[in-house]
């Protein structure tokens, strides 16, 4: 995740601030902490835990209790690390597995308590947009169209864009 595009534009920040991004993916949950200074974000910490939540969906598309517990345990550890952060410093998003799970609301209610921050289940197009922006900012500027492919645990995004804008 390129954190500079994970957050809404931050106005009037003259001193360095910490920001955190949490990605609840199908295979792993990730926590990335960065320091914002003068419009730039520098990563200072990255934690990735393999929870395999997508593999915990049963035939009826419900998350099994073991998969939910693994997610809650991970988010509790992330929450401990984020103690002292304010809600405006943290953005947590969930992707395909929680878009798909019929009992996502039950998981998310406790997940928010474990983490201590809101968790947003983002749409496929929003996930693709964030992926494209993150990749585009890491590549050299080009006037050519770009194709970015993200192969995830339960979904694959193909995003075409130009410069820093996904189409």
Which stretches of residues belong to each language-model region?
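Metal-dependent DNA phosphodiester-chemistry modules and their immediately adjacent helices/loops
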Residues: 156
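Primarily the dimerization/phosphotransfer
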Residues: 27
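Nucleotide/phosphate-binding catalytic cleft detector across ATP-hydrolyzing
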Residues: 4-24, 32-151, 159-167
